Structure formats: structure tokens, C-alpha cells
């Protein structure tokens, strides 16, 4: 909710898309932003509808896992905005794209890493946690150059992991 609140406060054109094929379970009530009334519902839908109603800012959702590079690249393609800077002057501005990799498997992290490497401009924030520890890594690409390495550049062993997408389990 904090990122959504920030986007709302900045009053900038933004697209907010949540993708998740998981349903809310009792164990999610402890560490995630869900309430008992959400049990059994799609996580992406619950959060998108909640944030849209609270902040009055549109939120989109995909109620399934993103498991192909093509689908991920389509979702993170930046929009172009035309901004008037004077009576006869218009400027085209590219949307800033943030990819939040809140995934629980390394095959999905590898997919996000590949999308990061193919993007011109992208901020990719990956988070992961265990019972008593966790990490957040922020990778940044600007004009086709990596400014800050993504999680796969810092911990390359995750790119070699042999786990599966959630739908393959």
C-alpha cells in the first residue's frame, strides 16, 4: 500500500498492475496485507480493488501467474505521454516502469531478470523472505545500461536454480 499511496500523492500519470494467481490463505493474514474477509479470493484482485477504492486511482490486475517473457514484456512496456510545455510546445514523456518481483521461486526471478536485461529503462525491485530473514534488491536500467545490478546480478546462483513456476507444481 505504501507504493500505491506514493504514486497517488505524486499525482503523476501511472499504471498500476498486480499479477498473481494465488488465492488468499490463512497463513497470508500474518505477514501480508489481507483481512479474514479476503480468504479464498484472488490476491491480485483483492488488492487492486482495495487500492482503487481507497485512493480513487485505477488499478489493473491479472488473476494468474506471469510465466512467459512475452507476457511480462507486454505488461512492462512503458506508455508514452504527451505533455504541453507551452502554447505551441509539446513534449513526449515515457512512463517510468517499476517491476516489483514479489515472487517465491527462482524460475520467476529468472524471468524478471531476462526482462530487466532486455529493457531500455526499468527499475526492478525484488524481495524475498524466509521465516527470520529477507532481502530487497533494486536493479536499475537507464538508456539500455545497467546502473544497479538486479538480484540475478548480485546472486547469480538463483538464475541456475531448477525450480518450477507455480502452475507447474
Q: Where are the predicted features?
A:
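Adenine nucleotide-associated cytosolic modules
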Residues: 1-169
Amino acid at each position: 500500500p505504501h507504493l500505491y499511496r506514493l504514486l497517488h500523492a505524486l499525482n503523476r500519470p501511472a499504471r498500476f498492475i498486480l499479477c498473481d494467481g494465488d488465492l488468499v490463505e490463512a497463513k497470508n493474514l500474518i505477514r501480508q496485507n489481507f483481512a479474514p474477509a479476503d480468504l479464498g479470493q484472488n490476491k491480485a484482485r483483492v488488492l487492486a480493488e482495495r487500492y482503487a477504492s481507497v485512493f480513487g486511482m485505477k488499478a489493473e490486475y491479472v488473476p494468474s501467474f506471469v510465466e512467459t517473457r512475452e507476457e511480462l514484456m507486454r505488461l512492462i512496456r512503458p506508455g508514452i505521454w504527451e505533455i504541453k510545455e507551452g502554447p505551441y510546445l509539446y513534449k513526449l514523456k515515457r512512463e517510468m516502469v517499476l517491476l516489483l518481483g514479489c515472487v517465491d521461486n527462482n524460475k520467476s526471478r529468472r524471468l524478471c531478470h531476462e526482462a530487466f536485461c532486455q529493457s531500455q529503462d526499468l527499475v526492478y525491485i525484488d524481495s524475498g523472505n524466509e521465516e527470520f530473514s529477507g532481502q530487497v534488491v533494486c536493479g536499475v536500467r537507464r538508456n539500455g545500461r545497467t546502473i544497479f545490478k538486479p538480484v540475478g546480478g548480485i546472486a547469480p546462483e538463483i538464475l541456475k536454480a531448477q525450480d518450477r513456476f507455480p502452475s507447474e507444481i
